[in-house]
């Protein structure tokens, strides 16, 4: 009996060992089933290997498999299902494989005209269908079910990548343009724009603190066909219209026609619940703040959110534009999904000019960009993470762990601010002054203040030129003063924020923000990864590998430069001529890049592409801001070139709708017939001393060249070989006499070598 018991135990041990070999210690595969498209490949990880591994397809007409170094690679051959087996010395594993038919597009290429569209059918879609245009200045693309609509924007060739979860296909697109864009119909041209290219706001919640309110500004100028500005006898209105695409250039048709709520809907923001406590102003819901006149205690009337009802704009004689200051548009569309209001960073409005009889003279469509992607939650949100960079901002007494995520990171910031500053006499003095001005502020700190129901306005202590009264040419947020009228030594908001965070380690890159030379550092706090604020012709420029040629630091310098005490935030800004001067490239916009000795814009001697000095004329300061500068025919620079950070042609197609409408292609409004009935003949009377273009210039340019005009280098380069500034915008046919007829495609850089052997041919 004893021997039988021993034998039985021995038997159990053998069974257990075999079980371990065949199961616990046997090879494992991940994933255990897989889907792959025809022609596509996928990998299967193999672990716990014992001995030689063999991988076999049970139907190689459907799927093939190879194995190397712990990884089996399967490749789809044709649609169907088949199993593959993966075996080692101990066990065999079976992996079911589904091969889906490759995604296909019909037709595989399209040829359309500018402003025309074509539909393309997509079949064999697996999962989510996506479509991306390689060049949105030539063609844009939108999706509806399994149909792609391609729209011609500018003449040229491009491609559209169509993909789903397992495969992709390429659609070739040709957009045909006319030799010259047709003149705008009618006798007027209307140009409208947003002043900054992107406005930021705090988002949904204003109950804890506020950096920036919803505040957007719309400008417009009207030209008649004699090229003169129309400044009287017209009315100007704006109204909400659906945009064409979202930030990813995918068709959405979003509408943003209110900023509070409709009926019993949840409000898009609680801003109007706190305007009185924050700013001492109490506009009705849907009416925004207006800083103009506030410096002298007489603010102008606020303007409403865009709606389906046209709202009036007013004429500003000083700046010679029609304006709607402080429009309180939010980054939330009227449409909702399961998470609430859908984000809409590019609300669209239509501006309409009418005569005194109500006849429409001209219309323009533009965006009022706004983003709440200006959050600090990446470092200040309560978290259980142990990432040293992510918890560096954790208050010593712990996170607040507020269940309201919109309030949580803000309360953490105030808690940390109190923790680090409350013992300082300057901080105590500031709290005392705030309390004397508004009893809602507590002398015990800013977090107790917010928790008691009084939201904190950051710029109440930290001066900011972002709050600018352009009527009185001064900031309305100049910091705190004591009872003797002396200002407290509290650093301005722009300076303190950039200096303080220059040494902060980005949790994602583990690099100090100041060390970064690309836009990821700025996009950590500024509207970035989703909004794509820096989207203009410079911001979208890339290398052959797809890397950005320019970043925020290219113009503004690093964070220490932006926060340098020598510069005035929002006043000392880089200017066009800082880089664009003397016909040379690779210029630097500001001093101190790398050494941060100054951080102020470089002012060259050459002002061909200059903004205007002392615009606006601020006493004691000498700004020359692009958004206040004018050029050819009294037009604002932004009217023709586009808003700051969104210079034409923009990466976001909705920005380009207006320039396409007035001249037939996306880009700087550069075609004379956009504003003039006929093309003027001039040697240097155009914008920036520009000459006439087209056939009329063929004979005239000879005299200009003989006179040794140095102006040629500004656009054609110091070697006269052409630059992007000499590129034509749409395909043109030019008769150059003895040199024949030239057919130049859009984008061709005209140079002396286009017809001659250089600038001084024999």
Where in this protein do the model-derived segments appear?
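Low-complexity "stalk/linker" and mucin-like segments enriched in Ser/Thr/Pro/Ala/Gly
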Residues: 29, 58-70, 105, 133-146, ...
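Short S/T/G/P-enriched beta-strand
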Residues: 26-43, 93-117, 169-218, 223-255, ...
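Bacterial N-terminal signal peptides
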Residues: 11-21
């Amino acid at each position: 009996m004893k021997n039988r018991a021993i034998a039985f135990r021995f038997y159990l041990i053998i069974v257990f060992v075999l079980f371990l070999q065949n199961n616990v210690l046997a090879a494992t595969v991940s994933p255990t089933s897989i889907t792959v498209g025809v022609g596509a490949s996928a990998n299967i990880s193999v672990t716990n290997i014992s001995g030689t591994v063999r991988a076999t397809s049970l139907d190689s007409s459907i799927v093939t498999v190879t194995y190397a170094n712990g990884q089996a690679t399967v490749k789809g051959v044709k649609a169907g299902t088949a199993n593959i087996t993966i075996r080692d010395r101990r066990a065999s594993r079976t992996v079911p494989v589904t091969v889906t038919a490759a995604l296909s597009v019909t037709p595989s290429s399209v040829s359309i005209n500018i402003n025309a569209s074509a539909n393309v059918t997509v079949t064999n879609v697996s999962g989510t269908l996506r479509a991306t245009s390689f060049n949105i200045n030539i063609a844009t693309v939108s999706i509806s079910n399994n149909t792609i609509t391609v729209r011609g924007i500018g003449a040229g060739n491009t491609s559209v990548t169509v993909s789903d979860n397992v495969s992709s296909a390429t659609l070739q697109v040709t957009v045909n343009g006319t030799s010259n864009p047709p003149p705008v119909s009618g006798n007027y041209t209307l140009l409208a724009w947003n002043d900054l290219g992107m406005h930021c706001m705090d988002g949904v919640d204003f109950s804890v603190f506020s950096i920036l309110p919803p505040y957007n500004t719309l400008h417009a100028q009207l030209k008649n066909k004699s090229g003169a500005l129309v400044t009287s006898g017209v009315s100007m209105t704006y109204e909400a219209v659906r945009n064409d695409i979202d930030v990813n250039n995918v068709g959405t048709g979003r509408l943003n026609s209110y900023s509070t709520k409709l009926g019993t809907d949840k409000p898009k923001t609680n801003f109007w619940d706190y305007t009185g406590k924050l700013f001492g102003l109490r506009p009705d819901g849907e009416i925004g703040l207006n800083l103009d006149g506030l410096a002298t205690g007489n603010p102008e009337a606020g303007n409403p959110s865009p709606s389906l009802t046209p709202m009036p704009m007013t004429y500003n004689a000083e700046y010679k534009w029609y304006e709607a200051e402080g429009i309180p548009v939010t980054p939330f569309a009227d449409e909702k999904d399961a998470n609430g209001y859908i984000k809409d960073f590019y609300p669209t409005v239509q501006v309409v000019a009418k005569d005194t009889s109500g006849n429409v003279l001209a219309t323009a469509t533009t965006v009022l960009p706004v983003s709440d992607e200006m959050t600090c939650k990446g470092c200040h949100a309560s978290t259980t993470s142990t990432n040293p960079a992510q918890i560096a901002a954790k208050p010593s007494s712990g996170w607040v762990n507020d269940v309201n995520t919109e309030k949580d990171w803000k309360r953490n910031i105030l808690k940390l601010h109190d923790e680090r500053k409350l013992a300082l006499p300057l901080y105590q003095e500031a709290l005392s002054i705030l309390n004397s001005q508004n009893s809602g502020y507590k002398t015990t700190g800013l977090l107790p203040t917010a928790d008691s129901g009084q939201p904190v306005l950051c710029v109440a202590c930290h001066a900011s030129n972002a709050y600018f009264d352009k009527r009185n040419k001064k900031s309305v947020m100049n910091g705190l003063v004591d009872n003797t009228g002396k200002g407290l030594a509290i650093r301005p908001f722009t300076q303190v924020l950039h200096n303080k965070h220059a040494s902060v380690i980005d949790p994602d890159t583990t690099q100090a923000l100041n060390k970064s030379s690309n836009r990821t550092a700025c996009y950590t706090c500024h509207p970035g990864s989703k909004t794509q604020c820096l989207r203009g012709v410079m911001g979208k420029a890339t290398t052959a590998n797809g890397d950005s040629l320019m970043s925020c630091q290219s113009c503004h310098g690093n964070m220490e430069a932006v926060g340098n005490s020598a510069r005035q935030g929002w006043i000392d800004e880089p200017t066009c001529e800082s880089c664009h001067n003397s016909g040379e490239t690779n210029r630097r916009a500001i001093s101190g890049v790398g050494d941060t000795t100054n951080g102020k814009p470089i002012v060259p001697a050459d002002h061909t592409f200059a903004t205007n000095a002392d615009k606006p004329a601020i006493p004691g300061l000498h700004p020359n801001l692009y958004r206040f500068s004018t050029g050819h025919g009294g037009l604002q620079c932004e009217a023709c070139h586009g808003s700051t950070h969104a210079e034409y042609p923009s990466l976001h197609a909705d920005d380009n709708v207006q320039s396409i409408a007035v001249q037939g292609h996306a880009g700087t409004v550069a075609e004379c017939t956009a504003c003039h009935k006929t093309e003027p003949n001039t040697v240097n009377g155009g914008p920036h001393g520009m000459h006439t273009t087209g056939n009329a210039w063929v004979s005239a340019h000879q005299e200009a060249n003989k006179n040794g005009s140095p102006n040629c280098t500004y656009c054609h380069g110091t070697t006269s070989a052409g630059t992007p500034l000499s590129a034509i915008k749409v395909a043109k046919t030019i008769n150059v006499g003895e040199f024949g007829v030239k057919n130049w495609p859009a984008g061709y850089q005209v140079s002396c070598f286009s017809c001659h052997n250089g600038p001084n041919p024999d």
